């Protein structure tokens, strides 16, 4: 695979596209205009926790959704709006379109991709799966529509453990793609027989245990929150490990007043909103300043700007199209995930 060289090329491409900061007046203008366009077009804005705070705030203000990728998929599927504007990365827009082929799905930019998606080309992955036909294919949501169509199950980080445990209980062996760190974490937690694809997130892979230990020494009373896309040595230092929504819940429920957070810093918007009396500190990345590749913020998530949201709504640009031949194949593993998580929710509610 050529993932490392691909990352460097993509980063160079992104460096030329960093958005310029807006004045307070410009920001207020865009927020008003976007809200009006959403209402006019019967559209709803859904945003991921890793988007910039202004995008998350706008989604909340306009009756949309700020959540992890599982809830984004569920919300877009259930909301009556005819247009869904997805502020996130491309696989999220594709997922919304697969689940809602009759709706118009827009994204602020179609260039917002994901290193996990890039690192799992469908031809290579299909060939890998064909070599192990006896295994159940489980793919992370951070993959293309074509890769999802090759899978038996799609999972997000908030439901991956439970789904893999269920498959393991049924005696199934697994192919896992694309994030090797998340796959390794699930394998350790469940003991499942898993073949792991060799992919990684450019944000989470930058967290390193030495720097995290150094920071913990500065804040000895802080709890460490870690996303399982991080390397094992980082995960092992965590007081809580989980998806974005699970880390937010941990911040609310743990008694600590200070947290060191090893995930994309976009999550701080929701953590600070829900826990205004607590302090959140970015976990250090492997590099400092200009030396780090992501500096704890996904460069593709940062491409979701107010200007691009408004332009997309007014011009209809950034519309997501998925090959109609892929949709029936890709919707099956997605529906399995949604049905599984819905059944789990109902079970929890019944036991409450």
UniProtKB/Swiss-Prot annotation:
Highest taxon of source: Bacteria
Pathway: Cofactor biosynthesis; NAD(+) biosynthesis; quinolinate from iminoaspartate: step 1/1
Alphabetical list of InterPro entries matching this protein: NadA (IPR003473), NadA_sf (IPR036094), Quinolinate_synth_A_type1 (IPR023513)
Any one Gene Ontology BP term: 'de novo' NAD biosynthetic process from L-aspartate
Residues reported in the UniProt entry to bind iminosuccinate: 48, 69, 140-142, 157, 227-229, 244
Cofactor note: Binds 1 [4Fe-4S] cluster per subunit.
UniProtKB keywords: 4Fe-4S, Cytoplasm, Iron, Iron-sulfur, Metal-binding, Pyridine nucleotide biosynthesis, Transferase
Catalytic activity: iminosuccinate + dihydroxyacetone phosphate = quinolinate + phosphate + 2 H2O + H(+)
NCBIfam families: nadA, PRK09375.1-1, PRK09375.1-2
Protein family per UniProt: Belongs to the quinolinate synthase family. Type 1 subfamily.
Name by which UniProt lists this protein: Quinolinate synthase
Organism the protein comes from: Ectopseudomonas mendocina (strain ymp)
The organism's taxonomic lineage, starting at the top: Bacteria, Pseudomonadati, Pseudomonadota, Gammaproteobacteria, Pseudomonadales
